[in-house]
Amino acid sequence: MISTIALFWALCVVCVVNMARYFSSLRALLVVLRGCDPLLYQYVDGGGFFTSHGQPSKQMRLVWYIYAQRYRDHHDDEFIRRCERVRRQFILTSALCGLVVVSLIALMIWH
């Protein structure tokens, strides 16, 4: 029988890998955004997005832009595809992180 702790750690590894994929896709989206829509790139603080001096309020603008699917009216097809990918990966990563938290609580209760 599979150990529940081993299963929990496997779930954590899957979650971390998906987080890395999400951040990589987000970085690629910002590169595409810089080329196709420089004003939006500045609006969401594209240059300082992954730095320690990045502005969280501007970063949240990109999150809400993607969450509300406002990118669907954009003129660049590559940008739309990248936004769709980032949105799907964000939903998947959020669900996996929630599952990790629920699993951790369950492990604390049953062990």
Swiss-Prot record:
Q: Does the keyword Cell membrane apply?
A: yes
Name the UniProt key words of this record, in alphabetical order.
Cell inner membrane, Cell membrane, Membrane, Transmembrane, Transmembrane helix
Which cysteines are disulphide-bonded? Answer: none
What GO cellular-component annotations does this UniProt entry give? Answer: plasma membrane
The record ties this protein, via InterPro entries, to: Universal_stress_protein_B
Membrane-spanning residues where? 1-21, 90-110
Cell location: Cell inner membrane
Q: Which Pfam families does the record match to this protein?
A: UspB
Question: Per UniProt, what is the membrane topology?
Answer: Multi-pass membrane protein
Q: Which domain of life is it from?
A: Bacteria
- What protein family does this chain belong to? Belongs to the universal stress protein B family.
Q: What's the name of the protein?
A: Universal stress protein B
Organism of provenance: Klebsiella pneumoniae subsp. pneumoniae (strain ATCC 700721 / MGH 78578)
State the taxonomy lineage: Bacteria, Pseudomonadati, Pseudomonadota, Gammaproteobacteria, Enterobacterales
Name of the encoding gene: uspB
